[in-house]
């Protein structure tokens, strides 16, 4: 077993955050600490700490736990933001960057950010434009290691906020994936398990630099995470 790494998780209550937590059950090579705005039910068998605090206090929490790496799975949906651009930016841009700035100030070495396929600050689509702006600003912060994950449509169990179009996309994903080739491969649906595994694997890597991972890169990284044998229940 490799040395234990201390990882902070922001966005612990969302699809990727909860999946990261699930992937840490039985892992002795990861000491996970979640940071969230509300209480959440933790899965059976997980050994981790969960700090519940307002975002203004997250810097203090990061300072207290002193993680080597931070996984940022923070994000809202257009529906949860009340379909207002300012409310969406407040979470997906402002809060992400404020968290990253606090981590950088406290000398967190590695930052893993879950973005989106198609992220581009010049995009004509608001969602992808915001995601691209975040990536651009994170790159300027010069973490020792920065990994940006750009998954396509996420497939996994999400707490009751699936939009009709998103539910249809997931149902059609097997066929859609077969039709997406070349530069469009990056938009293929991908399991949340794979994204979570990749985030953990990348958080454990010490090589310095800035790296962007599309769907194929995410799947490759996920395969490098050592597997854990869970006890039968």
Predicted region positions:
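NAD(P)H-binding glycine-rich loop region in Rossmannoid oxidoreductase-like domains
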Residues: 48-98, 102-105
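SDR active-site strand-loop-helix element
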Residues: 10, 35, 73-74, 111-117, ...
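Conserved Rossmann-fold NAD(P)-dependent oxidoreductase catalytic core, especially the SDR/UDP-sugar
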Residues: 15, 84-135, 140, 144-149
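Short loop/helix-cap segments at secondary-structure boundaries that form the rim of catalytic
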Residues: 38-47
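N-terminal Rossmann-fold cofactor-binding loop
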Residues: 28, 34-39, 54
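Oxidoreductase cofactor-interface core, primarily capturing Rossmann-like NAD(P)-dependent enzymes
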Residues: 5, 27, 121-229
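N-terminal Rossmann NAD(P)H-binding glycine-rich loop of SDR-like oxidoreductase domains
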Residues: 2-27
